[in-house]
Amino acid sequence: MAGRALAVSNGEELTRLVVALAHQLGLEAKEQVKVARRIWGAERRIDVVLIHPASRKTLGLECKFQSVGGSAEEKIPATIKDIEAWPIPGLVVFAGPGFSDNMRGFLISTGKAVEFEELRPWLCLYFGLALD
């Protein structure tokens, strides 16, 4: 499976690998795109916005990495909910050994999350690119 050979060690690296994958697929990628404010006033930013250069179809990606179990996992449902307020479709891309099996199951069940190692085929289907 594409991506399996790439070991992700932190959140910044996950974002970098997502952007690199987008470029390999011929997509534009913009990082830390501001999209208004959250209800309590904090700026809402999307980690990565992908744009198909011909169709201009867009997709926002939140990149979540967790190396050990802990409270960061508890914030994921709020992230899934926050994506609903974006002006474009969105997805959580997650990686790391710190996500419990229950959280992995929850994320996948929402239809709004994908593990990094499964991102390439997901993006190909979403943007209408060749599956190779």
Which residues make up each language-model segment?
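Acidic-basic catalytic patches of nuclease active cores, encompassing PD-(D/E)XK
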Residues: M1-R37
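Short amphipathic alpha-helical segment that frequently serves as the phosphate-/nucleotide-binding helix
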Residues: T15-R16, E43, I76-I80
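Glycine-centered loop/turn motif at secondary-structure junctions
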Residues: H23-L27, P87, G111
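Active-site metal-binding core of divalent-cation-utilizing nuclease and nuclease-like domains
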Residues: E28-S55, G70
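Hydrophobic beta-strand scaffold residues
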Residues: A29, G90, A113-E115
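Active-site-proximal loop/turn and secondary-structure-junction residues that shape catalytic pockets
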Residues: V35, F65, R120
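Catalytic cores of nucleic-acid endonucleases
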Residues: T58-L59, K64-T110
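Domain-level recognition of nuclease-like catalytic cores that cleave nucleotide substrates
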Residues: F94-D132
